[in-house]
C-alpha cells in the first residue's frame, strides 16, 4: 500500500523536478549555442577560403598576358614559358569543395600545384635580367607590379584563412565542442592549414 505524499514531500518532488527540467534546458541551450559557434566559425573559414580563391583567380588571369609580353621580347625562353603555362593549367584545374577543405590529401595536392605555379612564375620574372628590352618594357613592368600586388594579397588571405582555421579547430577541440560534434553525428572535422612550402618562399637564382 502506497503511503500518501505529504505536502513537504510534494514540495520537494516539485522542486527537484523543476531543477532537473532547468538543468536539462540549460544543457540543451548550451549545446545549441556551442553548435551555433562551430557553424559560425566554420562559415568564417569558408569565407576566408573564398577570398584566397578570388586572389588566385586574379593570378591566373594575369599569367596569359605576362607570357605574351615575355614571348615578344625573350626569344629563347620557350621552355620557361611552357612550364608557366602548364603550371597555370594544372593549378587552375584543381577545384576544392567545402568537403575537400577538410581533406588533408586534397589540400596538399592543391598546395603543391600552387607552389609549383609560384615557382614557375618566379623563374619567368627573373628572365628580364637577360633581356634589356623586356626589362624596359612598360607592359611587362605593369604586369609585374600587378602580380606582386596579387601575391601579397594571396599571402595575406592565406594568413587570415589559417587564423580562421586555427580558431575553428580550437573550438572543435574543446570538450564542449567535441561533445556537441559527437552528439550531432560528427558534421565537423578539423581543417588542415593552407601554408606555402619552404621551397616556394626561396627566390630563384638568376643563372644566364
What are these regions (language model features)?
Residues 2-208:
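A helix-centric hydrophobic-segment signal that preferentially recognizes long
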